[in-house]
Each structure stands twice: as structure tokens, then as C-alpha cells.
Amino acid sequence: MKKKFLLLALIVLGGMSAFAEESPVLELKQTVVTSDSFGTPVRETAKNITVIGAKEIKEKGAKTVADALRGVSGVVVRQMDGASPMIDLRGSGATAQFNTVILLDGIPVSGLAGFDLNTVPVEEIEKIEVLQGAGAVMYGDGAIGGVVNIITKAPTNKAVYGGAGLEVGSWRTIRENVYLGGKIGNKFLLNASYSGYTSEDYRDRDPKYYGRKDFRNSTWLRGKYLLDNGSIALNYNHSEDKDYYTGYLEKKQFDDNPRQKGAWGGYTYGINDIINAKYNQKINDKIDIFLTGGYYHNKSKYQNNVTKEYFIRPEVKFTYAKDSYVTLGFDYRDGRREFKDDVLINGISQKAPNDKRKSFAGYVMNKSTFGNWQFTQGYRREKVEYKYSSKVYDPMTWQLKEIKPKSADYSNNDSFEFGVNYLYSDTGNVFFNYTRALRTPTIQDAGAWYGPVKTQKNDIFEIGLRDAYKNTSISTSVFYINSKNEIYYDKTNPFSSNNQNFDGKVRRIGAQLSLAHYFDKLTLRERVSYIVPKVTSGTYDGKEFAGVSRWTANVGATYNITKGLTANVDGYYQSNAYAEDDFDNYFSKGNNYVTVDANLSYAFENGIELYTGVSNLFDKKYANAVTSTRSTWAPGPRKVYYPANGRSVYAGIKYTF
């Protein structure tokens, strides 16, 4: 298998000759902040990073963060009705939620109980940076697949500006947004915005919820004070999200009518408050400082619990030569989940214990430049503490018998990375990166755990290339990931379903390719990724890792028909996969699909824009998720389906000034 990896590497590197001449830089001078808080150009990053800008998000007609990320090489978006989308980077499968670190303006928000991506309206997004197979040194525990950084729009240095929008669509969907910004004096910038959403959704509701709409409301307030060689920024976001959901469908139900209600129904209702603060200052030519801090508060009205978390990260950058520097950083996170309802234990009501998580970490990163060669090294030491409880149920009555307080201390979580980047032309670079990434069991994992508890360790090797030749940009890489003690949920035994560590190793080998061609009025995009996830030892030795498609692809085109009139079309493909929990490959693969989205917009010179579009143009029937049940009761072991949305249409109007 190593020979196959080397062959893939030769294929990638062999393409260098075709892109080795100087050419206009189309995308490679973008500055990214996810791999380095102080910012660095994409081509000077020895890591696989993708940037989805506000322009691309708008052109493809994305309605959510999940829509914006669709089609990115190596990225699969998973979603069940009533749950936040899960961003799967490089084949994590069903545990993707805890193997990807989600940042909002550089602040981790996917900590104690996860974060609902639906609460961030796309109208608020400046860009999304996707860092794959890296980020463990800066972000630590959980950065197994990588990092997704959602960067919202900062206040603009204008006297006054604003806008509003209204959209209507299928299933009685309405979206609206309004924003206003300006500056006070020469240094203080402000903006405020509101986004709203209501919908009856694609699938039928439980009868007791007929006629009720999902809704999301989000308010943002931002301020920025300009300093000499720096700035201070403060962001506040308040959001409410109510989502009615329904459960899975059996195969016949799914085939007959995927819109019908499932085996159960209910709703989620969350209220979020997020405060982020940033201070950056260039002290002199040698020293830069960066301080970030945040507070996240979530109240679940349906489950009646409160989650809150504090975060702070100071960083200092010392420049010791041209394009050479060392960064020292420290971060601290303190989170808890408070349960407001009592629980019944053997018929007696008592207070449910709270969950707590703390982490402390220090890290150092160095970058040294020698001519066209750049070398990076990083090391992180992290300590994670958990306090939680496991629940014991009577095997006959399923009555809660006991709550056992537990704690866990992971004191020696060491992550490190090494990278080499060669700038072989004014636009092209080829890189190698090695990362050791770690993941400790989450509180959700530990509450239903079987066997010894071990830290998951991933060793990630990657070779990649980026360049721009004439009117084409290219980004490609091959990777090899070896996972030890991988954490997963095993339900192959119908009488004992638990979280546990794999008793063997999991290997993932893959390649990614992204191309964009820019003509006078036309832009063409092709993106494809391939991954082979195999269990290489232990109980499931030789089996394919569950819930991971080998192939994903996106082909798209944007055409500026005339001044102001733009058309866009995107096609998406995902190949067959085993059910998300079918680790013994008991069932056959399935659920491959091709979908097409299209939209059209016209922007007038007076600031008004009209647009319309259709998602899933050909009304393709497929599932967002496929799981299984190993029940010994009739109808026995089988796969079950969570349908994706069918065809939907929308139209809207925007005004900006």
C-alpha cells in the first residue's frame, strides 16, 4: 500500500513541469489566518488549505454554511433532520463532529456540546477557511480531520453603508436580512445586522406539529477600533433556533415517499450568545502580539440545560530574519453543561450532576526561510480534564438505576508538526507536511463507554502542489493517514452498543484535485477527491471504514452573460458507501447520487439585485445519512434512511448602498 501512496505522489509531482512557468496569480496571494493567526499567503503555507470567499458563496446560491462547503475537495457534509450539519474532513465517518474543530472568527465553538452551524447566516460570512489534515498544534484536541474557520464580515471603513434582502422559496420558506454600518471619527468602525428564516421544511411533521415552522433569528453587533499598526475588535451574536424534526424511514418508505414522517418526531430549541474579542498590535519590526478571547452560552429549552464556555489565547510572534519567525502561544478553555431538570433514580428524584471540561495548552511554532525553501516546525503540550457522569439502566425495565460521577485526566497530549515548502516559481509551490494529531473521548463518548479509555492518535503525511498557469489555478495533494485507538460507536452487537477504541489501526490513503479556469466571462471549476479507508488490524481487519464514500466530485460553471446578469450551475457526485455504523460491512454499499443546483441573478447599477434558483434540479432521491439496526426482533437487521431534501425553488431581491 505504501507503493500506491508513492505512485500517487509521483503523479502529483510529475505535473509540476506543466505548471513551472511564471503566470498571473489568481488566488495564491490570499492571506489566510487559520494556520497562522498573524496571517500568511496561501502559497507560503505548507498545508492543505482551501478558501471559500463571499463571492463564491453568493455565486453558487449557498443558503447555509453546509451549502457553502459542498463540493470542496475532501469535504463531506452530513446532516440528520433536527441536527447541526457535521463537516467530515477526509473520511472520519459518523464521528466527524468530534474530529473537526469549528472556529467562529478564530475562536473554538465546537467544544463541550458541539455548535449548530445553521445559526451562522451566509450573509454574515466574509470567507471560510478549511484546513485539512493539519491544525493540531494551534488547536489541539479534536483537530483529527482538520479545522473549519468561519470568518464573518468585519466593519468596513466607510462613512455609512447598508443593505436589505428578502427571499421566498419552497415549503413556505422565507429569509430576510438587513444590515447597517459606518464609522465614528477616523478610527471607530461599527456595524449591526439581523437575519431571519422560517420554513415548514421538506419532510412531513409529526401530526402534533402540523403547521408549525422552523425558525432561526440571528442578530450581530460588531465594533472595531483602529490603532497605529493594530486594532481592537469586539463581536456579539445572539441567535435563536427552533427546528422540528422527524426520524428515519424504512427502505420501502424511503422508496415510496421520502417526504413522509419517520419513526418519531420532536423539536430542538436553542438560544445562543457569543462574544468574541481580538487585539493585535505590531510593536516593532521584530515583535507582534495577538490576543483572542471568547465566551459561548447556549440554552437548550427543549432539553432544559445550559452550556457555557470561556476561551483565551495570547500569542507573541518574534521575527528573527526575513520571512522567518517563531510564535509562542497559550490557550485555556473552561466549559460546563448544567442540567436544570431532576432525574429519577429507582423512582427517587434527584439533581442531575453537571458536566465539566477544562483544557490548558502551550505551543511553539517556528518558520525558517532559506532562499526558496521554507521549513516549519510546531509542538503543543495539552492537558484536558473531564468531570461527567455515566448512567446505569436496569436491563429488564430500562429504568435509570444509578448515575456514576466520573472524571478523566489526559495530561500528556503532545501534538507536533513538520513541514517543508518549496517556492519553485513566482506562483507555484510544492509542500510536504507531517502532523501528529490527538483526540480524547468527549463527555458524550465517555458517558456510554466500553473497555479501557485511550487517546486517539493520527499520523498524517501529505504532499501537495499549488500553482497558477495562464488562466488556470490548480491545487492538488496526496495523503496517508494512520490512526491508532480510533474512537467510534459500535452497534454491531444488538445487545451492547457503546463508544470504544478500535482494537486495531485504521489507514486512509487518498488524493485531492481542484482546478479553476478563468475566461473573459466564464469560470469553470472541477474538484474531485478519492479516499480508501481501511481497517488494517484487530476485530475488523480488512474491512472498509463505515460511512465513507471513496469518490466525491463537483463540476461548476459561472457565466457573466451581460453586465450585471450572471448564471451559475453546480453538479455534485458522491459514490456508494457502507452505512455509518456498519463496521463489519454486514450490509451492501449504497446511496450514490448526482445532484444539480442552478441560479440566475441580475444586479442593477442602483444597488438592487434580483435572483432566482433551484436546488436539486432533477429532484434526485437520496439520503443525508444511512444507518443500520441489528435488532433481533422482526423485521430484523436492516439499513434505515434519513432523506435529503428534494427539489426546491427560490427567488429574492437585495438592495445595497
Question: Where do the protein language model's features map onto the residues?
Answer:
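Conserved C-terminal beta-signal and adjacent last beta-strands/turns
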Residues: L7-L10, F19-A20, G181-K183, S193, ...
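N-terminal periplasmic "start-of-domain" segments of outer-membrane beta-barrel proteins
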Residues: E27-K58, P85-M86, T100
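Extracytoplasmic beta-strand/coil segments of soluble accessory domains associated
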Residues: A66-I107
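Short acidic/polar hinge/loop motifs at secondary-structure boundaries
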Residues: I107-G133
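Periplasmic-side early beta-strands and strand-to-turn transitions of outer-membrane beta-barrels
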Residues: V137, N149, K158-A159, G165-E167, ...
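Face-selective signature of the C-terminal outer-membrane beta-barrel domain
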Residues: L226-E240, Y267-L400, P405-K406, Y410-F416, ...
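Gram-negative outer-membrane beta-barrel transporters
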Residues: T369-F375, V384, S473, F479-N482, ...
